[in-house]
């Protein structure tokens, strides 16, 4: 227990290598400590040691099969490794254990979208939002899926909901700009891209999108500056 606490303390101050050592010492004393395997997995994930993170989450789940957050994190790590079908199974397991797990529904939606299963992704995002209506990321992700389905007006509403919850959400401003651009509302799209850049000045995609919109409006000098 002491080594687990010291590991958490090291993690809090950003000493991740020391964190790993403390958790491993805890597991040497008590190998069936599911929470420490989970904590070790989170640390490996932060260190981008994804294969090690997967092993730690799997060990946690072997000890505690109903560990919903470990299922969710395992899914997220598998997704990062490109193992999308396995990630889907992990998220579904997390949801089976904890049906009101909004993050797991959202993450499942992200993975289904990557697999090209847009209708299923929409349903997952909608379930996340039914549980957590003020979930800005969920509204943004639902907007992206609807955008890809060509449902632009519905996508606009989703991005606007995300921004009503989190006005500093640069990605949602950019995505709203894209939807408005496709609806040929170029002046409004420009404002969205500009807001995204104000929030996140190094947002390359927003600069590029702003340049394209300004070019379409015939503002060539301003367009060139955006591309620069």
Per-segment meaning from a language model:
Residues 219, 223-228:
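Short, intrinsically disordered, charge-balanced linker/junction segments flanking boundaries
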Residues 1-12, 35-46, 69-80, 103-114, ...:
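Conserved alpha-helical positions within TPR/SEL1-like repeat arrays
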